[in-house]
Structures are given as C-alpha cells and as structure tokens.
Amino acid sequence: MNTLAAIEIRPAIASALKDGLPVVALESTLISHGLPWPVNLETALAAEKAIQEQGAVPATIAVLQGKLTVGLQEPELHDLAKAEDVLKASRRDLAVAVAQGRTAATTVAATMFLAHQAGIRVMATGGIGGAHRPSANPWDISADLFELARTPVAVVCSGAKSILDIPRTLEILETLGVPVIGYGTEEFPAFYVRSSGQAVGCRIDSPEVAAKICLEHWNLGGAGLVVAQPPPVEFALERTEFEKALALAEKQAAEGNVRGPALTPYLLDRLADATCGKVLKLNRELVVENARLAAKLAKELASRQ
C-alpha cells in the first residue's frame, strides 16, 4: 500500500484539490495539547473560518482511531478538543498511531508530511518547533526543522515558539537550506513577541511575492519554506515581560524534572498562568491571522498552476 492510499482525504478536500482550488492544511496539536477547552475548539473553528473567508478550503489533519485523516469535520474537531489520551504525533509516530488504532494530533512535521502526500502546498500554525535553550536541553531539536528540509510545503507561522533558542533554530534552518521569509518584518518573530532581534533571510509584503518565492524554490528542487509574520501588535507581549515569565517557568520545569515531549506544553501552561491568560488570547489571534495569510498564499499559488 502506498502512502496516499493509507490517507483518508475527505471528499470536500479531494474535490477542491482535483479542481485546483486553494487548500490550507492545519495542524491539530494546537487543539489537543496547545490550548485548553473551550479555547482550543474556538480557535480551530476560527482558523477554518478565516481560511474560508479568503476563498480557500481548510483541511485540519489528524489521526482518528488509526486513520490518517485530511479534512476533519466539525464534530470531529469537537471530539478531539475534548478528548483525553490523545497522542502527540510527529512524523515518526504516525506508524505507531495507525498500527495501534490510536487517535493522534499531528505536529507541524507530521502535518507537513501528510499535507504533501495529499497534494496540499501550504499549512498554517502558531509557531514552528526548534532548538531548545541550553538551560533546558541543548540536544532537544524539533523534527519540524528537518521536515522543512525535506518536504515541499510552505509553513505560515509567527516564527518559532518564544521558549526556544531562536538564534540556534535559525542557524539550523540555514544549514538545512530552508528559506526564512519575514512577512511585513525584517526580524524573525518570536511567537508571543513581535521580534526576536534576529534577522530573516528576506522581507516581503504581499502574498504574490511569497507565492513567487515558493514556486522558484520548488522549481530549484527545494523543500519547505517558513513564512513568518509577527503576532498582532495589540496582543503581543513585551520582550522583558515574556523573559521574566519564561525564567520562572523554566525554573519550575527543572525542579519538576519535566523534559522531552512534555516540556513545551508544560512551559506554555506556566506562561499562561504567569501572564494571567494573556498568552491564550494571543495564541488564538495569531493562529487565525496566520490561517488568513496562508489562505491568501494558497490562492496565489493556485492561480499560478
């Protein structure tokens, strides 16, 4: 059985792809691991709505009881948002989830992989994974970075999560040959913070230019790209405010011996507490804005087929 045959592409998504319509993939770890109920469901639905309003088709991806699924329906989003014991699946975990009949939420890496297999060229997320800070674990490097180096999908995001070592993350992306494009910015966003202080490879200010860069990159045999736009200014945190909250969260994680896949969700939970929930509102808003931009990019790509 080939990979495509193992994926259930829902009829609305399959029809859109067949007709050359713009489709945007959405990851699902945000729903199961990134945000609490009911903010997780509200955010997922708002992201899909933002894509539809731009004239594109949303395709949330997950593993449902062992079935690789592209294009979750609203009742399934609801079930995933309330479910417990949901596996957090990167690309390496997909076979385990399928073989064991598990329900799993897909990370950026797994979503990219499945989106590409389905024929989708653009995905949206809050932020990509990256290299953790040395104070956490210098060897903890997200599979997202390596997936970007081998899978031709454009990932629209607000940079890398602020809890990461962003300079090192950008160095790895450069080494892997992954273009990092700033949308409306010359500095790489840091998820909760509008700027990390690190320069991007280039700045663009329109979906048209983004589409041209994507197509040229793919024509040259390139794989993934990062299109990073800052979080909405009215919701973003100040860098000093964030760093103070993060220092406390990292201290608590070290004291509790929290590491591995559990570290990022733990730190995000502590940050939500330390900022009195401000990061939850910000997370929702930036995901929706990224979904909107991804839809515009997908439309430009579709018009150039």
Report each predicted region and the residues it spans.
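Active-site glycine-rich loop that binds ribose-phosphate moieties when present
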Residues: 105-107, 136-149, 153-174, 206-212
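Solvent-exposed alpha-helices and their adjacent loops that cap or buttress functional pockets
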Residues: 15-18, 23-24, 53, 113-117, ...
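Glycine-rich nucleotide/cofactor/substrate-binding loop typically near the N-terminus or early
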Residues: 28, 33-35, 41-96, 219-233
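N- or domain-start disorder-to-order transition segments that initiate the globular core
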Residues: 1-20
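General beta-strand structural signal in soluble alpha/beta enzymes
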Residues: 24-26, 59-63, 104, 122-127, ...
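A C-terminal functional module that forms or caps the active site or interfaces directly
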Residues: 221-289
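Anionic-ligand binding region
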Residues: 192-218
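A glycine- and small-aliphatic-rich helix-loop capping segment at beta-alpha/alpha-beta transitions
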Residues: 38-44, 76-81, 130-149, 172
